[in-house]
């Protein structure tokens, strides 16, 4: 899990995704490829560059970032190893209540194209929420979009864990840390 704390790893994984293609296949071209900001439309107090941060499709750039982290395919199987030699395999559990399966499959393929292995598994919504609540997900797989009026009337979207039980809560440990006053 340490690798997820590295901004270059997260950026590499982001720019390895072809959001335009994913929009066409998974959302019938109806979406707007962007980074999640929590707001739509973006309010004046939010920096517009947040919507496009690390959203360009750049597999060569992703490969360069991963190379720079010392993640290399040392055994020739097409999958990168971590600097300590361990394989990195991302478990992509998802529920179709939160995201379409083909979207998850596309993400897995884009990441495979830059040497990151993953296992895609559909689970029930209850299994997903249980794993999410207990911080057992490698990657949060959930589509997200909220109109500004809902965001402004719902502080759950602005405070860790950034949602309620029925949404995509992606900061459970941070919320626990805040609730415990840092202990």
Task: For every predicted segment, state its role.
Residues 1-28, 32-33, 37, 42-183:
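Extracytoplasmic/periplasmic ligand-capture domains
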């Amino acid at each position: 899990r340490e690798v997820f704390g590295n901004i270059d790893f997260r950026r590499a994984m982001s720019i390895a995704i072809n959001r335009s293609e994913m929009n066409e296949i998974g959302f019938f071209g109806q979406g707007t490829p962007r980074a999640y900001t929590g707001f739509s439309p973006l309010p004046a107090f939010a920096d517009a560059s947040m919507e496009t941060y690390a959203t360009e499709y750049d597999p060569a750039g992703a490969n360069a970032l991963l190379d720079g982290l010392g993640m290399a395919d040392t055994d020739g199987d097409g999958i990168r190893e971590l600097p300590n030699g361990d394989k990195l395999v991302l478990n992509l559990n998802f529920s179709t209540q939160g995201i379409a399966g083909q979207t998850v499959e596309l993400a897995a393929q884009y990441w495979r194209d830059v040497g990151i292995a993953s296992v895609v598994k559909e689970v029930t919504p209850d299994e997903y929420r249980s794993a999410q609540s207990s911080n057992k997900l490698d990657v949060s797989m959930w589509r997200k979009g909220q109109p500004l009026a809902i965001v402004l009337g719902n502080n759950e979207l602005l405070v860790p864990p950034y949602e309620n039980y029925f949404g995509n809560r992606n900061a459970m440990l941070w919320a626990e840390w805040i609730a415990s006053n840092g202990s």
